[in-house]
Amino acid sequence: MTKVISFILNVLLTIITIVIIIGAYYMYQVKIQKKDYANLFGYSLFEVATGSMSPTIEVGDVVITKLTKEVNENDIIVYMDGKNIITHRLIEKNGNKIITRGDANNSEYKPIEEKMIIG
C-alpha cells in the first residue's frame, strides 16, 4: 500500500512540476521577452474576454490555439488586431484578406490579413 501511495505522490509531484515549468516559460515570454502572447511548441492559451462568440465560446472560457498555415471558412480563429487578441469565426477568405464575425454578431468586421492570425 505504501508503494502505491508513493507512486501516486510521485506522479502528482511530476505533474505539478511540469505545470510550474510551463507557467514560468509563459511568464518569461510575456514579461521578459515582451511578447503579446506566449507560445509553446506552436500552442497558445487565451481567455475569452467578450461574448462575441456566444453560445459556442463563452466569456471566461480558455481556448487553445495551434499555429497553422491554412485556415478555411467556418474555422474559429484567434488573431491580433493591434494589441487586441480576438476570437472569431472565419466567414470568407479572398486571397490574403479574411472576413470574420463573432457567432453572437450579425455584422461583419473589417477584413484582416492572413498574417494577423495566431491560430
Language-model region placement:
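Residue-level detector of beta-strand face positions
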Residues: E47, I76-V78, I99
